[in-house]
Amino acid sequence: MYTVNPQLVVLVDRQQQLREVRYLSLYGTLDEASPLYYFAKQHLRAETLAVERRHILLTLKISQLKGYLCHLLGLREDIIIYSHKNNLEYSYVDNTIFNPFTMTQKKTLIKADSFLYNVYVDACDFLVVWVARAQDTPVPEFGSFEEVDANILKFEARLVEMFPELDLEFSIQSKFNNVFRTNLRSTGLRNIVKRNQDNRILFIKTDEFFITMSGNHFVLNNEALNLSIWDAQGRLAISSDGDTITVNDVRLFTELVTDSNLQMERIKGDITYRIFLLSPITSKIKLDIETSFIFVETATNNILLSADKKISIILAKNHISIKVKNHIPNIEKYFTFLVIFINRMFNAVQQAVDFTKIETIYWSRICQNTRDKNRKPVIVSSLDANMERVSDNFFRSPTREVFVNSNNIMFSCVDPLGKYNSVGFLAIFYKLQKMCIPCCFLRSQAHTDTFISCVHHRELDRQLVSPYVLNFGKIVTEAKISFLPILFDQFFNEGLRIEFEADHKRLKATDGYHVVKCCTRSEITRLRTQRDIIQFVNAEQNTLIAGDMVYFPMHGARSAGAEHQRVYILIQEIVHEVVMVQKAHDSDRIRFRELERNRLWEFFPYRVPSARIKEEHGLVLTTDGFYVDGKLFSEPLSTRYVAFTENVGTAGVAAKYFAPVFKYVVTEARELFIKTWLLNVMMQLGLTGESSAAQTREALERYYRLS
């Protein structure tokens, strides 16, 4: 849980004696355990602290801060603000801390209107601002008066009001991107290795002859030289190829790199924080009032910039990404706090966010207004006096209906044309994920299954499936079925019979026919990218149809038995299943049967029978893997140890032998996949770069005969 730290405003007189000490806290109470309280009592010797539920926004410019302080202290005269720790409005060329009561050389003073969090480095944790009337100092000409920005006060008032409602529970991952061009080379990296005592380290020097093995993986690296050092938490702290170095842990870097001749030229430097939220937010923020003193809007409504445009913030439903140029202690936590508050303030109606988007289906697309149709419900603040309660969440009067969702947001249909005034619910949302999403209809929806479920909380028999068969392409709910695409319909249903009613859509009877139904999973499975598809197919160990492509699992050659008979199919990025459907003439009940045989396996391009290569003392090496006492060895190996094996080319005898298989491979890194495949095969068969072409081909045909 993030705690917004208190702040101190100290007003002093001509003798620098305390006149007022304001303790600003959004919690409205003194935190006697805080460093600030200790500072006020032990160092300032303040007898009393005036506690106020106020907060100085750390994103203010110094001129805005001065206006805020004038208003806070009730001053209508020139003031000078300063700090005992940092320079604020004025600074010396040599960065000596400015104090208006102990001036040195006026000529070396620089005045700047910077942002508070930039000039006061630990403002997030320990903010103390000193204020003096200009006439009480030896340099009254340095003072000025600023009017407070009314928008800042308005924003602060809303913050104070809503602060108790904010959920500031979140976790943070950080990544430093400090990249330098260096002259370390191989000798410099070896010296770092020698100085390292406690951290896990991997130093790789490769060429075209050798490949490094670490743990269960080949280290396939295009760099001839690579040094990686991890910290105690297992995070990559330092990485270098001799020419450039990436520093994620500055402290560790300074400990290990002591070469006085080291040359470093910064190429890139920033820090990315990824904040994971306990409570979701709305990723699209529209700032409706003046907030330029905090954020700057961009053309993309889920991206914000700080007021100085040096910090970028990307919003998502469950996390926030913040990129900063320079390290400012806890600034990522402070901006997360501001984002959560602004999201809460400007998007209160988005408590109904549950229907803004569900996977690929958008509420605004399905239930949208057009020139003569007003189907999108509006949010209302109260019920009419003459409304009758239909259920605990639905109310009706002769002219209006109101639905109250689980977040107590009230929706009603108010069509200026007087047509779409009946509140109903989108069936597809409810059938896919049991979500009651309101929409406006021409006629009462009280008779529909979805209305009965959402309003009266009565679940209907979901085993009843409509005998009407949909054309392929629409998302299929649990009460529907659809045809397969024409190509696959002909393939799967060759020789099978099906009868339809006269309208050719209503299923009359069949002893077995392949159709598409929804996946029987607790949640929708959505595959957005090719990577998603590959991961899904390999995890399920089943086939997937996507467009005109059929995806087989990587290890499909090992087994195509009963457990590998499922066939999935992708419709609008949602995973569905291919099943057999049965229906008798005298019944409307549709029955489903899992596939007895997946004919797609006949086309799997790599069917190789398992063969034993070597066996000794209960250890068996096969083309399928390494077995210990009959069990496949799959234990993760330690990455603390490094071994080497001979490199392979992707154009040799083995590569040409497997070329008929490789042309079917779908991967994001084709060359690395082929090299890994060949390395595994060559190691299993004990082949080396010195093996002749005839010897290599003979071994491949013996153990990996392609059918």
Swiss-Prot record:
Matching Pfam families: Pox_VERT_large
Key words of the record: Activator, DNA-binding, Transcription, Transcription regulation, Virion
GO biological process: positive regulation of DNA-templated transcription
Subcellular location: Virion
Coiled-coil regions listed in the entry: none
InterPro entries per UniProt: Poxvirus_early-TF_lsu
Protein origin, superkingdom: Viruses
One GO CC term, this protein: virion component
UniProt KW Transcription keyword: yes
GO terms assigned for molecular function: DNA binding
Quaternary organization: Heterodimer of a 70 kDa and a 82 kDa subunit. Part of the early transcription complex composed of ETF, RAP94, and the DNA-directed RNA polymerase.
Membership in a protein family: Belongs to the poxviridae VETF large subunit family.
Known function: Acts with RNA polymerase to initiate transcription from early gene promoters. Is recruited by the RPO-associated protein of 94 kDa (RAP94) to form the early transcription complex, which also contains the core RNA polymerase. ETF heterodimer binds to early gene promoters.
Protein's recorded name: Early transcription factor 82 kDa subunit
